[in-house]
């Protein structure tokens, strides 16, 4: 027999699904976050500091129209291409090889990392953990994850669903020249603020599965500073956030040397120390891994 918490969770799932089915045609308009927002007990009284204190910046909802006075999606993406070095230089970047470090949430110290990427959408990331090599590969169509037995119950598995889609986006965004083709169904742009004082424009498109993907571009520099994509789950959509920082010029193209991935159950940070542009990359680098190696 399941414990009371599991029984309650199942009852809540049924309740939320019933609300959405009855009132919104089955669309996931109401989720656990709508009421609980991270708390075991939903708040029923509004706090006064929410009325009289400094307003907090919430994640913008779905963008459905162009904000008055904001630049168009094309203008924002064109400025981004100019910011990284211009269309000609961006197109001239066809591959790159990088070294750096990776640290996960709760890890004691960073470990060595290598990335090989080839335009338009191939990417392999190798993290040298204490247990062995952890490899994520996307060959332009298929993806795999290989890791030591000590870190995963399945040493080699094919990526599917949201994991495969995320690997594709990471491979595509390694080469900014094609940014307009990465997503479809662009919805317009809105101004927003990250943190306390970073003004950005947010544009929204759709991934191959139709889920929204939001891109955040700095007001002044035009550079991409954040990507947010979504994963469909039983309890609603989960968010995956990728932050880009420390842009440096490599062969005339500005590239982020710091990336931070954050999701519901973890976080990973990459810091690159060396990037070689247009370095030769063997096609075998993007093949299905043989399995975890030491």
Where are these regions (language model features)?
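The canonical Cys-X-X-Cys-His
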Residues: 1, 29-39
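Sequence context of c-type cytochrome heme-c attachment sites
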Residues: 1-27, 47-64
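Intrinsically disordered, low-complexity terminal tails/loops enriched in metal-binding residues
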Residues: 35, 47-78, 294
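Short Cys/His-rich "knuckle" micro-motifs
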Residues: 42-46
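N-terminal helix-cap/turn-to-beta initiation motif at the start of protein domains
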Residues: 69-74, 81-96, 174-181, 196
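N-terminal mature ectodomain segment of secretory-pathway/periplasmic proteins
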Residues: 81-151, 183-188
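Gly/Pro-enriched, hydrophobic low-complexity segments
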Residues: 124, 129-132, 194-292
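Acidic/charged, solvent-exposed loop-and-adjacent secondary-structure segments enriched in E/D, K/R, S/T
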Residues: 145-173
């Amino acid at each position: 027999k399941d414990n009371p918490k599991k029984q309650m969770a199942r009852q809540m799932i049924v309740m939320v699904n019933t609300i959405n089915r009855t009132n919104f045609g089955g669309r996931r308009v109401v989720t656990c976050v709508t009421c609980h927002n991270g708390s075991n007990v939903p708040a029923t009284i509004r706090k006064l500091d929410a009325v009289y204190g400094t307003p907090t910046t919430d994640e913008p909802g779905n963008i459905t129209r162009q904000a008055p006075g904001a630049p168009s999606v094309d203008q924002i993406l064109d400025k981004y291409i100019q910011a990284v070095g211009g269309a000609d230089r961006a197109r001239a970047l066809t591959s790159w090889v990088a070294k750096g470090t990776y640290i996960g949430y709760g890890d004691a110290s960073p470990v060595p990392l290598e990335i090989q990427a080839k335009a338009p959408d191939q990417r392999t990331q190798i993290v040298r953990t204490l247990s062995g090599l952890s490899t994520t590969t996307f060959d332009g169509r298929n993806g795999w994850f290989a890791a030591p037995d000590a870190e995963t119950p399945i040493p080699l598995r094919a990526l599917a669903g949201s994991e495969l889609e995320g690997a594709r986006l990471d491979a595509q965004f390694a080469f900014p020249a094609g940014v307009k083709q990465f997503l479809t169904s662009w919805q317009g742009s809105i101004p927003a603020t990250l943190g306390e004082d970073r003004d950005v424009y947010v544009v929204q498109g759709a991934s191959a599965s139709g889920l929204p993907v939001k891109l955040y571009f700095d007001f002044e520099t035009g550079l991409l500073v954040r990507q947010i994509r979504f994963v469909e789950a039983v309890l609603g959509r989960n968010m995956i956030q990728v932050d880009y920082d420390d842009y440096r010029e490599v062969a005339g193209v500005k590239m982020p040397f710091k990336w931070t991935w954050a999701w519901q159950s973890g976080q990973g940070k990459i810091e690159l120390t060396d990037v070689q542009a247009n370095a030769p990359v063997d096609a075998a680098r993007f093949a299905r891994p043989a399995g975890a190696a030491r």
